[in-house]
């Protein structure tokens, strides 16, 4: 096992215009303060205020959006980071681990990773992801990419259909089709901060949001040693070279994770479990009394000093005492949140320290709060009650189905841009309006300038005389559409769908 030295991980250099020379502790902290400013002031963060947490298109400001959720995760992440550093200081290990002059950057990287963790999520959350992937699967049929004979391939895009005698190109076709059918919010977050927004964050800060290490084009079995780290796509083919450079800069082995990402993940797990239940009460899906009984029933028999007793029952009893002039709901969730944090944060911090050799190496194949402990059971309890009584509620399911239809409908509306030939689309990009393509011209001009420029830049770097050019061009054209639609807020996507379907009231 390599020696633990966080100076080799907290890399303050950037991809472009990187600071040069040796830096003092204060100068390094200023570099990460610059990251904070870039992130907090980015439009992608502002858009989170109109993206779904659980309840799409919610008008009640007391119910969480992606932004308010991310701010809560940021605070919990800061709490865990401080707890870790405090315990390492007590153990006199800060200097031994190269952290004595990097405590500020350590905390800042965790906080900003937490704030950004949902930055790539599409409108309507996981149902938006599913809509994008299903729509592309119905046209690209990635499962046919291994088909024999090749005539069985049902891909509707000629450039990406497998052909006899073109095995090197066929392998690229397989990768592209697989990649495009595995849109994922975390992978889109990497693409957003590097390719689309050009935020030029430090290597360490980007490493903090590389939650999953599996490429989106992966087709084989995941290694048992990395099955958790690779359970979802973490980056796209379009960012392959950037991620390879990131791994080099952060001393990460293939498919390994940046150490501070485990803290961000734990903060998210702690935050959303309680928040989803609180939002459900705010939405009148159930009362606090009903929630308590759901939790009690799901946990089962327990001893007086059990974690359930110390966290949930304690919150319930204190909220019923009415010692404060606040509603039972407010008191219950205040105590539930405080009790949960006071138990889970120290536990997550100690798990991080206990497993630091594997975490530092990037190979710890678990979440900090997924084990055989009571703390893990408590999180599972919150999640299971939410799944059974919140996510399956008819109002929630109806909104999710509407969201799925909106995203599918928008992709269908913009489909003509994907149906144009390479030469015709190139002409449209150059001229912006082509008389013989009135519909396509209007659709193209509705795309955001940022996304169009990202497409142009990517295609301009391709060798136009290469037999791979038509494949890559189509890939980036699909990315253009995915970038545009996934970047919409819930409300904008809803309104845009109604406008373009001519159903606006």
Swiss-Prot record:
Belongs to the dGTPase family. Type 1 subfamily. Homotetramer. Keywords: Hydrolase, Magnesium. GO terms for molecular function: dGTPase activity; magnesium ion binding. This is Deoxyguanosinetriphosphate triphosphohydrolase. The gene is dgt. Its EC number is 3.1.5.1. CDD domains: HDc. dGTPase preferentially hydrolyzes dGTP over the other canonical NTPs. GO terms for biological process: dGTP catabolic process.
């Amino acid at each position: 096992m390599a020696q633990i030295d966080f100076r080799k991980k907290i890399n303050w250099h950037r991809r472009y215009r990187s600071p040069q020379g040796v830096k003092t502790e204060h100068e390094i902290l200023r570099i990460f303060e610059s990251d904070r400013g870039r992130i907090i002031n980015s439009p992608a963060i502002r858009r989170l205020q109109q993206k779904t947490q659980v309840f799409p298109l919610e008008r009640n400001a007391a119910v969480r959006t992606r932004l308010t959720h991310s701010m809560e995760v940021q605070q919990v992440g800061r709490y865990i980071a401080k707890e870790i550093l405090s315990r390492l200081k007590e153990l006199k290990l800060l200097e031994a681990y190269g952290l004595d002059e990097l405590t500020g950057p350590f905390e800042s990287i965790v906080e900003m990773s937490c704030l950004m963790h949902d930055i790539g999520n599409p409108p309507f959350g996981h149902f938006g992801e599913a809509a994008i992937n299903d729509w592309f699967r119905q046209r690209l049929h990635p499962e046919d990419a291994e088909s024999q004979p090749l005539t069985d391939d049902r891909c509707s895009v000629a450039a990406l259909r497998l052909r006899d005698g073109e095995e090197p190109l066929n392998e690229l076709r397989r990768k592209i089709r697989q990649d495009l059918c595995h849109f994922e919010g975390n992978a889109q977050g990497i693409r957003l901060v590097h390719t689309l927004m050009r935020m030029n964050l430090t290597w360490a800060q980007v490493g903090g949001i590389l939650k999953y290490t599996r490429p989106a084009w992966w087709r084989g079995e995941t290694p048992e040693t990395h099955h958790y780290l690779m359970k979802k796509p973490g980056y796209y083919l379009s960012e392959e070279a950037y991620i390879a450079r990131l791994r080099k800069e952060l001393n990460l082995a293939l498919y390994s994770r940046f150490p501070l990402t485990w803290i961000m993940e734990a903060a998210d797990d702690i935050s959303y479990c309680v928040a989803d239940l609180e939002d459900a009460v705010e939405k009148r899906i159930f009362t606090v009394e009903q929630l308590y009984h759901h939790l009690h029933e799901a946990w089962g028999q327990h001893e007086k000093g059990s974690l359930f007793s110390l966290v949930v029952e304690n919150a319930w009893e204190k909220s019923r005492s009415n010692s404060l002039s606040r509603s039972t709901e407010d008191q219950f969730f205040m105590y539930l949140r405080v009790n949960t944090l006071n138990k889970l944060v120290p536990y997550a911090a100690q798990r991080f320290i206990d497993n630091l050799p594997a975490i530092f190496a990037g190979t710890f194949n678990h979440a900090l709060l997924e084990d055989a402990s009571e703390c893990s059971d408590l999180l599972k309890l919150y999640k299971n009650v939410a799944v059974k009584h919140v996510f399956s509620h008819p109002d929630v399911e109806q909104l999710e189905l509407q969201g799925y239809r909106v995203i599918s409908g928008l992709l269908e509306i913009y489909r003509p841009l994907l149906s144009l030939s390479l030469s015709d689309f190139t002409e449209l990009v150059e001229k912006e309006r082509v008389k013989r393509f009135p519909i396509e011209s209007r659709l193209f001009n509705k795309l955001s300038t940022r996304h169009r420029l990202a497409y142009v830049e990517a295609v301009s770097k391709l060798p136009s005389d290469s037999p791979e050019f038509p494949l890559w061009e189509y890939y980036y054209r699909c990315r253009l559409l995915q970038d545009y639609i996934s970047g919409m807020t819930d409300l904008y996507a809803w309104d845009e769908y109604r406008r373009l379907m001519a159903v606006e009231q």
